[in-house]
């Protein structure tokens, strides 16, 4: 078994462990502020250089002083490399030797007041084999050059502390960024008398090629006042220096002044054009007046209607063209199709015929713009269709206007809305301007129809919302008895008209009365009735709870409910009947209209008596059952009767033909469905089914599904658990 010991067991950094030495940071800074000498680590390097010089100067130390070993040699810590002889690391060929080497550090953390830095040039240090041969490197010091550099050169490296802090006590230091390595010299500092060469000092050599490149890149451009062209050329030349990124940002001053200058240029250009146009108009009027007074008898040539070159230009911008707006096309067909809608009803009555276009509109010069006239575009939208406009037209569906009796409608107004009761085949635009499409009208947009909540069960979409959308389609032949007409009676079984007609009150209605209600939105009427019943039940339950809680008779309670509900509906209907009764000559239409209003009033009263009173009774009995907290047979009978009443209420909204002919099989199925008692356990088993499920396409909704058939999909709402 071979155990490999690591070669590098301890890292030595300046005669101590690596964990003992910490670079200065916010965590280990003392509370009192430190100067620049204690904030950097270059004095450690300088002290070690002095220590190595002292060790070389005294090879035999005194007996009381500890001798310096080869491992703790400070100079080998600094100037060591992988191949040095003093390195005892056996793995020195391909790894670190365990010592820090500060030979490559070059930053501007050690500034000095003067610009002269030198390595020790003693003969002992030059003769030493480990330190190598070191020569002094000097940068000439000239006060005039320093001031000129600070004033003209923006790229000169600026020390961090501007030379006002303390420095190391040792004279020796390493060259940093403040001296020769990153010093950028300008053309003013490169004069031949500026450098003072000292004897015995190797100066930094500067080649003439670097001088020319530096002076050409960094020297500021000197203007020649003699030639104006050179001045203009130099002023337009961009400077080679980099700007600060803070000026180039969006909110900087450069952006602000650039925008300001462009705005001023635009306004000046507009003012110049306006003044030029005024002067040209004035000169043209002056020439016209002088020519008319000078030669009034000269026969003028007949003006030929020739379009200018400016009128032949395209007047449509590319932004409008992307939206489908083209202004320079000859649209004779679209203008001809839109003309009957643009003309007023008075023009329609005076014309007395269909709007046939004039023969000159189809000619080629009908849409040519005259040279002196202004171009007035048609404000109406064109018939050009883009996919976005088709989508917009499909999503916005007009709400139907309720039908008015045909005697009050003028024949000139029937071309906008062709209703089932008003439009006749002989009326204006009734049979000619037919689009050939089945027009659908609804009370809600297609977005709400498509975006309703739904789940997918066995690859079939099942809606979760109970909304009934009143989509009524009209055939293009306007046939009322067509097989494609969707009757609202099959969809809206809880409407006030048909729910009352099932009871036998006013079962035969006029055809006009059915037409009057065929265009209505029963969803809104049903919601209003629900709100009214809820408010009335709140009012009556607050006043009559003490009197009705003990009694189980619901008839007396329904008699007390009706007077509070009836005044909410009757005044508007009575005002209509009074206004109709004040007419002096009552025709047969007004009599039938009054009869319809009376029937409507009785139907609404019957609806409130039957449906809403039954719901109030249901709520009271539920509250009575919850307060008892017992499962005696009497309360089980109450629950069974409640569920049967609720079942009767759900079946009360069928068609009159279906209501009277209920099969016995349906009754047996209903009794099996609604029986609350379980024969095996004797407990209550309630299968709640709302009256919404008995009608419409949502019969097989989420409540009537088995749990094994329902699977989660992406269309399921987030907050719902199945």
Curated annotation (Swiss-Prot):
Q: Which family does it belong to?
A: Belongs to the AIM44 family.
Question: Where does the UniProt entry say this protein principally localizes?
Answer: other
Q: Where is the composition biased (Low complexity)?
A: 79-94, 117-132, 206-229, 286-295, 558-575
Going by the entry's taxonomy, the superkingdom of the source organism is recorded as: Eukaryota
Q: Which GO terms describe its cellular component?
A: cellular bud neck
Looking at the record, which segments are called Disordered? 52-94, 110-161, 187-245, 275-325, 349-389, 488-511, 558-588
State the protein's name: Altered inheritance of mitochondria protein 44
Q: Where in the cell is it found?
A: Bud neck
**Annotated Basic residues bias:** 275-285
Lineage of origin? Eukaryota, Fungi, Dikarya, Ascomycota, Saccharomycotina
Q: Which organism is it from?
A: Zygosaccharomyces rouxii (strain ATCC 2623 / CBS 732 / NBRC 1130 / NCYC 568 / NRRL Y-229)
Polar residues bias locations: 187-197, 378-389, 490-510
């Amino acid at each position: 078994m071979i155990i490999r010991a690591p070669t590098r067991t301890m890292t030595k950094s300046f005669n101590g462990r690596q964990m003992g030495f910490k670079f200065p940071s916010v965590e280990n800074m003392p509370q009192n502020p430190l100067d620049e000498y204690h904030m950097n680590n270059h004095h450690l390097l300088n002290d070690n250089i002095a220590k190595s010089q002292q060790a070389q100067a005294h090879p035999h130390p005194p007996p009381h002083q500890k001798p310096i070993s080869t491992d703790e040699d400070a100079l080998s810590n600094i100037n060591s490399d992988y191949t040095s002889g003093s390195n005892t690391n056996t793995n020195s060929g391909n790894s670190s030797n365990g010592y820090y080497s500060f030979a490559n550090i070059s930053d501007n953390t050690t500034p000095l007041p003067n610009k002269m830095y030198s390595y020790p040039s003693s003969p002992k240090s030059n003769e030493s084999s480990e330190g190598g041969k070191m020569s002094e490197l000097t940068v000439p010091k000239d006060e005039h050059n320093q001031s000129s550099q600070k004033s003209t050169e923006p790229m000169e490296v600026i020390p961090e502390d501007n030379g006002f802090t303390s420095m190391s006590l040792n004279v020796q230091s390493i060259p940093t960024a403040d001296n020769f390595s990153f010093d950028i010299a300008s053309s003013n500092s490169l004069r031949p008398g500026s450098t003072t060469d000292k004897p015995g000092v190797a100066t930094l050599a500067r080649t003439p090629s670097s001088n020319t490149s530096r002076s050409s890149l960094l020297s500021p451009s000197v203007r020649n006042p003699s030639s104006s062209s050179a001045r203009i050329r130099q002023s337009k030349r961009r400077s080679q220096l980099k700007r600060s990124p803070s000026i180039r940002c969006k909110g900087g001053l450069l952006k602000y002044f650039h925008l300001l200058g462009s705005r001023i240029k635009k306004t000046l250009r507009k003012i110049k054009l306006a003044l030029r146009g005024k002067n040209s108009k004035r000169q043209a009027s002056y020439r016209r007046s002088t020519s008319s007074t000078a030669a009034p008898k000269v026969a003028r040539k007949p003006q030929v209607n020739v379009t200018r070159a400016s009128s032949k230009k395209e007047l449509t911008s590319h932004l409008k063209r992307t939206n489908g707006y083209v202004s320079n096309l000859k649209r004779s067909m679209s203008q001809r199709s839109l003309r009957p809608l643009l003309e007023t009803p008075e023009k329609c009555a005076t014309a007395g015929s269909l709007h046939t276009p004039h023969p000159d509109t189809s000619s080629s010069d009908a849409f040519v713009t005259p040279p002196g006239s202004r171009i007035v575009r048609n404000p109406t939208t064109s018939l050009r269709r883009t996919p976005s406009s088709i989508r917009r037209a499909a999503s916005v569906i007009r709400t139907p206007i309720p039908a008015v009796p045909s005697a009050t409608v003028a024949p000139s107004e029937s071309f906008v809305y062709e209703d089932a009761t008003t439009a006749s085949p002989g009326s204006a635009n009734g049979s000619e301007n037919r689009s050939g499409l089945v027009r659908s009208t609804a009370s809600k947009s297609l977005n709400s129809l498509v975006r309703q909540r739904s789940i997918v069960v066995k690859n079939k979409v099942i809606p979760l919302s109970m909304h009934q959308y009143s989509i009524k389609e009209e055939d293009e032949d306007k046939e009322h008895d067509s097989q494609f007409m969707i009757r609202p009676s099959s969809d809206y079984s809880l409407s006030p008209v048909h729910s009352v007609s099932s009871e036998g009150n006013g079962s035969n209605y006029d055809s006009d009365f059915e037409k009057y209600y065929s265009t209505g939105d029963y969803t809104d009427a049903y919601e209003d009735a629900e709100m009214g019943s809820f408010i009335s039940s709140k009012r009556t339950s607050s006043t009559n709870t003490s009197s009705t809680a003990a009694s189980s008779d619901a008839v007396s309670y329904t008699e007390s409910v009706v007077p509070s509900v009836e005044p909410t509906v009757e005044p508007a209907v009575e005002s209509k009947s009074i206004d109709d009764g004040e007419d002096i000559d009552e025709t047969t239409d007004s009599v039938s209209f009054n009869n319809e209003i009376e029937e409507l009033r009785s139907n609404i009263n019957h609806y409130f008596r039957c449906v809403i009173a039954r719901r109030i009774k249901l709520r009271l009995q539920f509250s009575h059952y919850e307060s008892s907290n017992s499962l005696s047979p009497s309360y089980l009978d109450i629950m069974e009767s409640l569920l049967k009443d609720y079942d009767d209420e759900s079946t009360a909204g069928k068609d009159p033909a279906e209501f009277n002919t209920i099969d016995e099989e349906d009754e047996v199925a209903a009794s099996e469905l609604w029986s609350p008692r379980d024969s095996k356990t004797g407990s209550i088993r309630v299968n709640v089914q709302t009256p919404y499920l008995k009608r419409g396409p949502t019969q097989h909704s989420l409540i009537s599904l088995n749990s094994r058939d329902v699977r989660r999909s992406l269309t399921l709402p987030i907050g719902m658990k199945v």
